[in-house]
């Protein structure tokens, strides 16, 4: 009987834990297309500046202050800032916190941005 209880408990835990690992991100999506306007390298990483267009935020100016992971030459963390001005002249700004990885010559960033319009954007 004790084995039956353990089996039922194990099954319940396995079934419940799999739903905790799955979630769906919903909401508005948009792409940012832009141009790198500056790169400054340091011994610990560097700073990248870019300008582009980002959906409802209009023309955006972005900065990534990147640090290297001491155990990997192809990943690290970053902080940054962003500012956008839409077609109506409205200005929004935000703080960026995230991680990055490099594959060949392409750097991909993943961040959570806290924006002055009250949104918290999950960015890739």
Regions found by a protein language model. Give the residues of each.
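Bacterial N-terminal signal peptides that target proteins for export
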Residues: 1-8
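Beta-strand-enriched cores of mature, soluble protein domains
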Residues: 21-124
């Amino acid at each position: 009987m004790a084995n039956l209880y353990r089996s039922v408990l194990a099954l319940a835990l396995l079934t419940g834990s799999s739903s905790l690992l799955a979630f769906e991100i919903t909401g508005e999506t948009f792409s940012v297309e832009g141009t790198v306007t500056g790169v400054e390298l340091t011994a610990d990483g560097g700073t990248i500046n870019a300008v582009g267009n980002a959906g409802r935020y209009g023309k955006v100016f972005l900065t990534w202050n990147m640090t290297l992971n001491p155990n990997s030459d192809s990943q690290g963390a970053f902080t940054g800032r962003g500012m956008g001005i839409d077609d109506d002249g409205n200005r929004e700004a935000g703080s960026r916190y995230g991680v990055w990885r490099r594959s060949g010559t392409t750097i991909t960033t993943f961040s959570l941005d806290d924006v002055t319009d009250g949104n918290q954007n999950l960015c890739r």
